[in-house]
Regions:
Chain B
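Haloarchaeal acidic low-complexity proteome signature biased toward cell-envelope/secretome components but also
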Residues: 1-52, 56-200
Length: 167, 200
């Protein structure tokens, strides 16, 4: 079984600096299990924006250490990919009564990266690691409606990082 | 004391200025949050719990009594003090959801002395901004918004939104009912969960 592990911004923020136990716990987990976290392009852009007074999350360190990589471009000509993108966007908009076109496209991109890997057959299961419950549940719901219910798991980024500390 | 104001127009705490002034002093906020959690407390207990000198403890308590957020519950010695409920209610225009955030907000402000992310956010956006962020933190944990929704509403970067939401999360889980969501390590198939090794 091949799985794709897709990581959102919050996972890297929750890990903290490479000197922290949280970061090291996730790295150890990835290495031990030969996992490379896949970061959608929009998420990578978000993580590497330069805001003063704040430490940049350790995404480049994880890429250099080869347990994270940036996802390839999304192929919107695959209809499952574009349907997933639109579906999650609507799901997130509906939760808060907003117009769908106001929803930032990094949220649905997590699910769209999963959809592309599943339909192209590069993975038979997608794990989405996010601290945004709405994005995680939206991805599960929309991909379930596309017949991929058993193939997608939303992993709560906070619980994941905390549980690795306890192991 | 009670007031209602609106998140969207940015005047979250306009009616709340006396308490907002108080919130400028994180030590006072810490003291208030401690009393709110512990109930009736003597000055001696506060000195011990918060590591305060006697003079400082009395100054803080008297200041909070004068502001009206603490009251003495006994006339005998030693006096005990308790918090008066202060309900600041915030209603969003979009969804009509209401939040009573006072105790959580005061606790959050009290943590700025030890939490750099909260301190940075207050320096940039003020206590009123932190109150707004707290409402998004509640909504995020409940699955109504994402950090990106907050970023676009408040015109800040998604990363800045994520950082303050994570800093506020322990407060949200302490003061609000949050259902757990999503899977964790045990739900990831085919992995070795025993990751305790020294390969770093």
């Amino acid at each position: 079984m091949t799985a794709i592990h897709i990581a959102d911004t919050g996972l890297f923020v929750a890990m903290g600096h490479p000197s922290k136990r949280r970061y090291q716990g996730v790295r150890r987990f990835a290495r031990r299990n030969d996992i490379t976290f896949v970061i959608p392009e929009r998420v990578y852009d978000e993580l590497t924006v330069n805001i003063s007074e704040t430490e940049t999350p350790p995404v480049d360190a994880a890429i250099e250490e080869q347990w994270a990589r940036i996802a390839g471009q999304l192929d919107y000509s695959i209809s499952l990919v574009s349907r997933t993108m639109d579906g999650v966007q609507r799901y997130i908009a509906n939760a808060d009564n907003r117009p769908a076109d106001e929803i930032e496209r990094a949220d649905p991109a997590l699910a769209a990266v999963a959809a592309q890997a599943l339909i192209e057959g590069t993975a038979d299961h997608a794990y989405i690691y996010t601290t945004d419950r709405l994005a995680g549940e939206g991805a599960e719901t929309i991909l379930q409606s596309e017949g991929y219910g058993d193939s997608v798991t939303y992993v709560n980024g906070f619980r994941f990082v905390e549980d690795l500390l306890d192991l | 004391m009670s007031s209602t104001s609106n998140r969207a127009n940015g005047d979250v705490i306009r009616d709340f200025l006396s308490v907002a002034d108080l919130l400028e002093e994180p030590q006072l906020a810490q003291l208030y949050a401690y009393l709110a959690r512990e109930g009736e407390t003597t000055v001696g207990e506060l000195m011990e719990a918060l590591d305060l000198a006697q003079g400082t403890a009395y100054t803080y308590v008297n200041q909070l009594v004068d502001t009206g957020v603490l009251e003495a519950t006994t006339d005998g010695q030693p006096r005990t003090y308790t918090t008066r409920d202060i309900d600041l209610t915030i209603t969003t225009t979009d969804s009509g959801r209401e939040y009573t955030i006072t105790a959580a907000l005061i606790d959050a402000v009290g943590r700025r002395t030890t939490d750099e992310d909260i301190d940075t956010y207050i320096n940039r956006h003020g206590i009123a901004g932190l109150a707004t962020a707290l409402t998004y933190a509640v909504d995020r944990e409940r699955g109504d918004v994402t950090h990106r929704t907050m970023a676009s509403d408040l015109d800040i970067s998604p990363l800045a939104a994520e950082i303050i939401l994570q800093a506020l999360r322990p407060i949200v889980t302490e003061y609000f009912e949050i259902e757990p969501s999503g899977g964790s390590v045990a739900d990831i198939q085919g992995v070795d969960q025993d990751v305790v090794s020294d390969d770093t």
